[in-house]
């Protein structure tokens, strides 16, 4: 009598054991592809200052003079950046757009102290803050040239006439009479409305400087944004003594073009746009949002999955490649295991059961035949 034997375990697992080593491959790749500290020269001074950054103590100044940045040529918070085989001094200051004017020791006015330090870095010369606010314009020196040195009366006349040109005006000596010329071009200045001390609104700080030059009076910035009366200056000098006479026309053109632009929203709109910048148009009462890449919606609250992302640089490309390889291997392993279970295992069970049934049927028939013969 043949006893029934329980079917053996799925033999497909034995076949699939050969693919288990593939699961260890991603871990191996991660171990091999660990970020290795390069022996090349660091790209900036900040790399040497980070705890996990470059070890700059092993560099010899005498052996790497070509690649080391001389502190005498890159001062005032500048950073040495290696581009190819040369090293240059880079001044990358993250200055905000706050308008807090300061006057530098070089006689130039800057939007705030950060821009003053950036200019000192670019010029590689020391620039100190002389006073808060814009610099007062330089007046004529009054020193006569070689032509007028012999005539004290002529020199005194020219000095007193040129002294009236202030607030950025230049003295035109070639004219028949001495004119104060305002050679200030604001056509390339960005739109940033401001309220001036004369109670009028201007499209940018350059127009305030131009109006101060035209009127020959001190006009300063009082606040960001337009004044409460929301008026824009369109007047020109009353005495008509200046060379430029198109100030009113230019102001009107700038006012018309400004209506098509957007200005930043006031502070009470902070948080209006979740992933973007809040902008306010002159013709619109409600603000609008300029969403960042990858976001959409009225408040930039929705994720836009249709955005095509730029391929990363060579530094991060190896990590993207490793991630892609790992993902591909994992998908392949899963597919192999699924196919092995769904196809190989049922087929092996069917063959094994058929053999058992065949053997059992033959033994039973033989027993019955021998009984009949007896």
Curated annotation (Swiss-Prot):
Bias (Polar residues): 356-374
Key words of the record: Disulfide bond, EGF-like domain, Glycoprotein, Membrane, Proteoglycan, Repeat, Signal, Transmembrane, Transmembrane helix
Domain Kazal-like: start-end pairs: 90-137, 181-229
Tissue: Widely expressed in the brain. In the olfactory bulb expressed in mitral cell, granule, and glomerular layers. In the hippocampus expressed in hippocampal cornu ammonis, pyramidal layer, dentate gyrus, and substantia nigra pars compacta.
EGF-like domain mapped to chain residues: 261-301
GO cellular component, one term: membrane
Signal sequence, renumbered to the chain: 1-40
Transmembrane spans: 321-341
Extracellular compartment residues: 41-320
Subcellular location: Membrane
Annotated SMART domains: KAZAL
UniProt modification remark: O-glycosylated; contains chondroitin sulfate glycosaminoglycans.
Membrane topology classification: Single-pass type I membrane protein
Family of this protein: Belongs to the tomoregulin family.
Free-text function comment from the UniProt entry: May be a survival factor for hippocampal and mesencephalic neurons. The shedded form may up-regulate cell proliferation.
Name recorded for this polypeptide: Tomoregulin-2
């Amino acid at each position: 009598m043949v006893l029934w034997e329980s079917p053996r375990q799925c033999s497909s697992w034995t076949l699939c054991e050969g693919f288990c080593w593939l699961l260890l491959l991603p871990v191996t790749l991660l171990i091999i592809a660990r970020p290795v500290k390069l022996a090349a020269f660091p790209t900036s001074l900040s790399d040497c200052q980070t705890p996990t950054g470059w070890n700059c103590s092993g560099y010899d100044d005498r052996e790497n003079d070509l690649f080391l940045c001389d502190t005498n040529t890159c001062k005032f918070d500048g950073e040495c950046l290696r581009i190819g085989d040369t090293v240059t001094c880079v001044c990358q200051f993250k200055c905000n757009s706050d308008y807090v004017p300061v006057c530098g020791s070089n006689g130039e006015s800057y939007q705030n102290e950060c821009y003053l330090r950036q200019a000192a870095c670019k010029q590689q010369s020391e620039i100190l803050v002389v006073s808060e606010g814009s610099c007062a314009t330089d007046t004529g020196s009054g020193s006569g040239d070689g032509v007028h040195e012999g005539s004290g009366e002529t020199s005194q006349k020219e000095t007193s006439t040129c002294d009236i040109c202030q607030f950025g005006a230049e003295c035109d000596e070639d004219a028949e009479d001495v004119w104060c010329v305002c050679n200030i071009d604001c056509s390339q200045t960005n739109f940033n409305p401001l309220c001036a001390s004369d109670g009028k609104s201007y499209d940018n700080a350059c127009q305030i400087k131009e109006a101060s030059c035209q009127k020959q009076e001190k006009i300063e910035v009082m606040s960001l944004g337009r004044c409460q009366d929301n008026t824009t200056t369109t007047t020109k000098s009353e005495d008509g003594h200046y060379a430029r006479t198109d100030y009113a026309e230019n102001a009107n053109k700038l006012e018309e073009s400004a209506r098509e632009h957007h200005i930043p929203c006031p502070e009470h709109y902070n948080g209006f746009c979740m992933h973007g910048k809040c902008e306010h148009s002159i013709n619109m009462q409600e603000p609008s949002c300029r969403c960042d890449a990858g976001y959409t919606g009225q408040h930039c609250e929705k994720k836009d999955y249709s955005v095509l992302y730029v391929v990363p640089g060579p530094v991060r490309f190896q990590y993207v490649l490793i991630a892609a390889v790992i993902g591909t291997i994992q998908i392949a392993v899963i597919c192999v295991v699924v196919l092995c279970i769904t196809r190989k295992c049922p087929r092996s069970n069917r063959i094994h059961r058929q053999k058992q049934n065949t053997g059992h049927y033959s033994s039973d028939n033989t027993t019955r035949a021998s009984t009949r013969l007896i």
